[in-house]
Swiss-Prot record:
Keywords: Calcium, Glycoprotein, Metal-binding, Muscle protein, Phosphoprotein, Sarcoplasmic reticulum, Signal. The gene is CASQ2. GO terms for molecular function: calcium ion binding. The keyword ATP-binding does not apply. Belongs to the calsequestrin family. Coiled coil: none annotated. The modification Phosphotyrosine is found at residue 282. This is Calsequestrin-2. Residues 373-400 have a biased composition (Acidic residues). Phosphorylation in the C-terminus, probably by CK2, moderately increases calcium buffering capacity. Residues 365-400 are annotated as: Disordered. Glycans are attached at residue 335. It is found in: Sarcoplasmic reticulum lumen. One of its GO terms (biological process) is regulation of cardiac muscle contraction by regulation of the release of sequestered calcium ion.
Length: 400
């Protein structure tokens, strides 16, 4: 009787919770919004939307695991399409075999990739294939490529953005030819790099900007770089950004994680794990920032900061692969080909390395004194030692 009473109370509580409005997380409603794209319907579909997301996939095989993986991605796309139904964003599937001609025409060459068509641009999504990540990415993509700053409060908000590459320019008006060039350059990098502009003399004075000048801010740096030789063409701005696109310290983000990981230096990444919300992680991150600021002119140095809180599904994998504890700050060098790694010895959270000690360790990495090949040698030694132990035990058994 007591159990029955508790069950009824439980159902009532759940029903009451479901009756509340304002926190209804979306669940797939079963309606098909993702359509198959073909040469026949391509132009019609393209005209219908401001953005078109195309999932380019290999033919669905008879393998059950492969079928389930495909269905999971299809459900993710259906949920994203449902959430963004009020936006002018379309979602389609492109079969690599059935629509090979269309895929070639669109320049698709990597099966399993998600491409977004916006105007005459094709953007490849190189991030985590998750509904929340995709929704945020697409919402950023439909925004204007340049955000206008016109007040002191907006300047403060701009200054607090420290973990993105950002640019800001001062122009006479939105009709200025130099602003138009800046806006067109911004479209090349949206939504990964943040572009801002102001037409306000007071804002420009506070940011020490001259007319038609653009400042480039590297992540976590105190001072910007004034792009030389103003005023600029679109091509000059694009070229400058591409040359400075790999910061000294950068954050791994779910929406561009694969592209960032592929942007290695000589096959390696210097990787730092630190939880920003944790006191020790925050302290370690501040040390990393200091090292980056002191070495920002070194083209061979790029540190990849990963906050484990951003990737909860990868924590166990990283701990197993790298043999480290991610509840503590860590820094190491990782071979991107085989995931071999060597990690700096940090005795405990209360004894974090100083900026000078970290710089010395990084210098050893860049010089090759510390490298992942040493880790391979140690593993081989361990294997040989195990084999010798096994041989000794076999000899003992024979003697008996």
């Amino acid at each position: 009787m007591k159990r029955t009473h508790l069950f009824i109370v439980g159902v009532y509580v759940l029903s009451s919770c479901r009756a509340e409005e304002g926190l209804n997380f979306p669940t797939y409603d079963g309606k098909d919004r993702v359509v198959s794209l073909s040469e026949k319907n391509f132009k019609q579909v393209l005209k219908k939307y401001d953005l078109l997301c195309l999932y380019y996939h290999e033919p669905v095989s008879s393998d059950k695991v492969a079928q389930k993986q495909f269905q999971l991605k299809e459900i993710v796309l259906e949920l994203v399409a449902q959430v963004l139904e009020h936006k002018a964003i379309g979602f389609v599937m492109v079969d690599a075999k059935k629509e090979a001609k269309l895929a070639k025409k669109l320049g698709f060459d990597e099966e399993g990739s998600l491409y977004i068509l916006k105007g005459d641009r094709t953007i490849e999504f190189d991030g985590e294939f998750a509904a929340d990540v995709l929704v945020e990415f697409l919402l950023d993509l439909i925004e204007d490529p340049v955000e206008i700053i016109s007040s002191k409060l907006e300047v403060q908000a701009f200054e607090r953005i420290e973990d993105y590459i950002k640019l800001i320019g001062f122009f006479k008006s939105g009709d200025s030819e130099y602003y138009k060039a800046f806006e067109e350059a911004a479209e090349h990098f949206q939504p990964y790099i943040k572009f801002f502009a102001t037409f306000d003399k007071g804002v420009a004075k506070k940011l020490s900007l001259k007319m038609n000048e653009v400042d480039f801010y590297e992540p976590f740096m105190d001072e910007p770089i004034a792009i030389p030789n103003k005023p600029y063409t679109e091509e000059e701005l694009v070229e400058f950004v591409k040359e400075h696109q790999r910061p000294t310290l950068r954050r791994l983000r779910p929406e561009e994680m694969f592209e960032t990981w592929e942007d290695d230096l000589n096959g390696i990444h210097i990787v730092a794990f630190a939880e920003k919300s944790d006191p020790d992680g925050y302290e370690f991150l501040e040390i990393l920032k200091q090292v980056a600021r002191d070495n920002t002119d070194n083209p061979d140095l790029s540190i990849l900061w990963i906050d484990p809180d951003d990737f909860p599904l990868l924590v166990a994998y990283w701990e197993k692969t790298f043999k480290i504890d991610l509840f503590r700050p860590q820094i190491g060098v990782v071979n991107v080909t085989d995931a071999d790694s060597v990690w700096m010895e940090i005795p405990d959270d209360d004894d974090l390395p100083t900026a000078e000690e970290l710089e010395d360790w990084i210098e050893d990495v860049l010089s090759g004194k510390i490298n992942t090949e040493d880790d391979d040698d140690e593993d081989d030694d361990d294997d040989n030692s195990d084999e010798e132990d096994n041989d000794d035990s076999d000899d003992d058994d024979d003697d008996e």
